[in-house]
Amino acid sequence: AEAYAAVPRIGRRTRLGPKQRESAWAVFAFVRERLSTRGVVTTADIYGRLTRWVEDGGQLPFTHVVVDEAQDLSVAQARFLAAVGRAGTADALFFTGDLGQRIFHLPFSWAKLGLDVRGRAQVLKVCYRTSHQIRRAADRLLAGEIADQDGIEESRRGTVSVFDGPDPVVELFDDASLETVGVGKW
């Protein structure tokens, strides 16, 4: 509980006070106990076990890893990949990702977990998956410069798409059934 209370929480929007952290820890402890009683583990637990196995000299059945959509990695997955990278050659890991597409996890420092890509990252400026119209609409919603927790910045300026499509339509509906009808008409 004390270790949990002392962990810095970079990127969190609302900070928890000591009493709130204590309450949260009680919930986590309860869930952990329930999982243990049922013989169930979380995905994070699996990655933690794999990380320890690699760090203890476990022999990997591969020499290189390519990670797509790297912006969606969890902390446990990033720790595992850092262990894989330390166990392999200098070029054992290759990541592709888009900071502007991070939607699943709160930001965290890759460098603090052992994945320091500063100075070795390349920003690609040609988009093959999204039309000009959708990309421009999305760019209006994002800041011109996006930075991660390690200070790596990615500029949206100069990015181009290779095809056109219809303009995105934004509509508001009063309820889910009207939204379903609206989507069906599209």
Say what each PLM segment does:
Residues A1-Q20:
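ATP-hydrolysis module of ASCE/P-loop NTPase motor domains
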Residues E2-P8, V40-G48:
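Short coil/turn segments at secondary-structure boundaries
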Residues Q20, A26-V40, T51-W186:
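Conserved helicase motor core of SF1/SF2 NTP-dependent helicases
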